[in-house]
Curated annotation (Swiss-Prot):
Gene3D superfamilies in the cross-refs: Fumarase/aspartase (C-terminal domain), Fumarase/aspartase (Central domain), Fumarase/aspartase (N-terminal domain)
Reactions catalysed according to its record: 2-(N(omega)-L-arginino)succinate = fumarate + L-arginine
Keyword Membrane: no
Biological processes, Gene Ontology terms: arginine biosynthetic process via ornithine; L-arginine biosynthetic process
Any single Gene Ontology cellular-component annotation: cytosol
Location(s) in or outside the cell: Cytoplasm
Native organism taxonomy: Bacteria, Pseudomonadati, Bacteroidota, Bacteroidia, Bacteroidales
UniProt name for this protein: Argininosuccinate lyase
Signal peptide (residue range): none
């Protein structure tokens, strides 16, 4: 049985140990690679201030790279009796290197270690989410251009209202993703600051070089105040969760639209048969389960900020074990969102559009505003034109050629997709993922 890093002479009650460890061994597997990267930067700094010899550093780096590779292969495990990933890595180093392995924790606490792991994990996941969003964005813009001349009804209060187009529909969700990415970018900038060196939350008497570890890990800056570095635990996760929830809100709305538009009562779009499921009793059914589940998963993700807020609510400054529970809802959320983005991207690329929706006379009245505007352009006061068209509708005399003449920015005839694409490109460039990627490659000795 492995000893705990804090092992005392009194044996802890087994039920207490089980309860306090909780799901940490499971959750910390998400953090294994990042814990190793943090340790590599930390020991490189320790050698620079004389707490490790060059030979000891070389030995530790060799073993840490080996542990990193095992985590990459999915072979890293946290043994029974070992509390967390930090303890497991130190245990492995001590088994392999003896006393040299015991030196790795100098100037460090599990408090700043887990905070560092979370930040390294989170910024990597934000990059992957951003890449998935960008892929969906390009599909939506492409479909917007492809179907820009196909009209569809626009709705207010779920009543037919005015002409819209599939160009507008696809493009609207593309532009929504641009704004969502601004939230994600803000979360990334907050996350991309180095907490290492704050130790238990009050710094260290070792002459740590925090600027060095900041550069080694590719952070933009560091959390300067060591007390605030620890106060950021919970706050960082909550703000990232808000960004994920914002994206989830867009995807949930898109999924809802797709479910409605795919139904026989609307018939605006058709999902590929291979993307639908059937019924055990009704042989004709082709259910949009993929979008129903996407909607549910995204609605669940929208509750994430509140869950984190309630766990961390009313905590004073300093570290508290309450924060451990946040990992259980926070760490898996990224994969859930990426799955939803991947499914949505695939379906949006394959979806078929009904190009003759407005041939149905039940949609005739959506052109009433077009007629009002035509009369107004010819000189009739708008309110008089409004009343005339209203009376024509009531009398059953209204007719229209079903043509639209919208030319202003962002309208049916002028989608501004190039401008929206430029906004997305500038937003993506603002993340500056290159710094973190290069730092990680350098630490691992990879090109």
């Amino acid at each position: 049985m492995a000893q705990k890093l804090w092992e005392k002479s009194v044996e802890v009650n087994k039920d207490i140990e089980r309860f306090t460890v909780g799901r940490d061994r499971e959750m910390d597997l998400y953090l294994a690679k990042h814990d190793v990267l943090g340790s590599m930067a930390h020991i490189t700094m320790l050698e620079s201030i004389g707490l490790l010899t060059k030979e000891e550093l070389a030995q530790l780096l060799t073993e840490l790279k080996d542990i990193y590779a095992s985590a990459e292969r999915g072979e890293f495990v946290i043994e029974e009796g070992v509390e967390d990933v930090h303890s497991q890595v130190e245990l492995m180093l001590t088994r392999r290197l003896g006393d040299v392995g015991k030196k790795i924790h100098s100037g460090r606490s599990r408090n700043d270690q887990v905070l560092l792991d979370l930040k390294l994990f989170t910024r990597t996941q934000i990059r992957e989410v951003a890449e998935a969003v960008e892929q969906l964005f390009h599909v939506l813009i492409r479909q917007s251009e492809r179907y820009k001349n196909v009209l569809m009804p626009g709705y207010t209060h779920l009543q037919i209202a005015m002409p819209s187009s599939f160009g507008l529909w696809f493009g609207a969700y593309a532009e929504s993703l641009v704004d969502d990415m601004l939230f994600l970018q803000a979360a990334f900038k907050m996350c991309n600051k180095n907490p290492l060196g704050s130790a238990a939350g009050y710094g260290s008497s070792f002459p740590l070089n925090r600027t060095m570890t900041t550069e080694l890990l590719g952070f933009d800056s560091l959390n300067y105040n060591v007390v605030y570095a620890q106060m950021g635990r919970g706050k960082m996760e909550r703000n990232v969760a808000f960004a994920l929830a914002t994206l989830a809100g867009t995807i949930s709305k898109l999924a809802f639209d797709a479910c409605i538009f795919n139904s026989q009562n609307f018939g605006f779009v058709k999902l590929p048969d291979e993307c639908t499921t059937g019924s055990s009793i009704m042989p004709h059914k082709k259910n949009p389960d993929v979008f129903e589940l996407t909607r549910a998963k995204c609605n669940k993700l929208q509750s994430l900020p509140q869950q984190i807020m309630m766990i961390a609510n009313n905590l004073p400054s300093g570290y508290f074990r309450d924060l451990q529970i946040i990992k259980e809802v926070f760490l898996p959320a990224f994969q859930e969102l990426k799955d939803c983005l991947q499914m949505t991207t695939y379906i949006m690329n394959e979806i078929k559009v009904n190009e003759h929706i407005l041939d149905d006379d039940k949609y005739l009245f959506i052109f009433s505003v077009e007629e009002v505007n035509r009369l107004a352009r010819e000189g009739m006061p708008f309110r008089d034109a409004y009343k005339k068209v209203g009376l024509d509708i009531e009398a059953g005399h209204f007719s229209h050629d079903k043509q639209v003449h919208h030319t202003h920015e962002g309208s049916i005839g002028n989608l501004c997709n190039d401008e929206i694409s430029a906004l997305m490109q500038r937003t993506i460039e603002g993340f500056n993922f290159q710094g973190m990627e290069q730092a990680e490659k350098t630490l691992l000795g990879r090109k």
